[in-house]
């Protein structure tokens, strides 16, 4: 079992929880409530919670990899790990650009941890 991949899995579970809580905060903002019922409101809300589910699923996947790190030798699993890492770094950069520092730090930390964990197992 890989402890570092297990730590990465835990970081995704925490990201998912934080993402969900953050969604509850910004969807209660007066500006956002003013567009309730619009397409932007519907897509923004469902998309946000789909993101939370994606982060949770990523945590489960990383937990599976922690139980059997040899799975990361498969090219498809490598590709999935790479896409997840790029997504985290891009999200972190987007949050920095838009002044959402706590989310930027959380995504950046998880990206670094995930990248290190995966590289440690495949190199």
Task: Go through each PLM region and give its residues.
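Interfacial segments of alpha-helical transmembrane regions
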Residues: 1-13
């Amino acid at each position: 079992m890989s402890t570092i991949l297990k730590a990465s899995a835990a970081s995704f579970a925490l990201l998912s929880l934080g993402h969900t809580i953050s969604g509850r905060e910004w969807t209660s903002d007066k500006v956002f409530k003013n567009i309730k019922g619009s397409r932007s409101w519907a897509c923004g809300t469902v998309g946000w919670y789909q993101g939370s589910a994606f982060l949770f699923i990523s945590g489960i996947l990383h937990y599976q990899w922690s139980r059997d790190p040899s799975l990361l030798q498969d090219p498809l699993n490598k590709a999935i790990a790479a896409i997840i890492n790029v997504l985290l770094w891009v999200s972190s950069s987007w949050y920095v650009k838009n002044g959402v520092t706590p989310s930027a730090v959380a995504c950046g930390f998880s990206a670094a941890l995930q990248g290190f964990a995966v590289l440690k197992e495949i190199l």
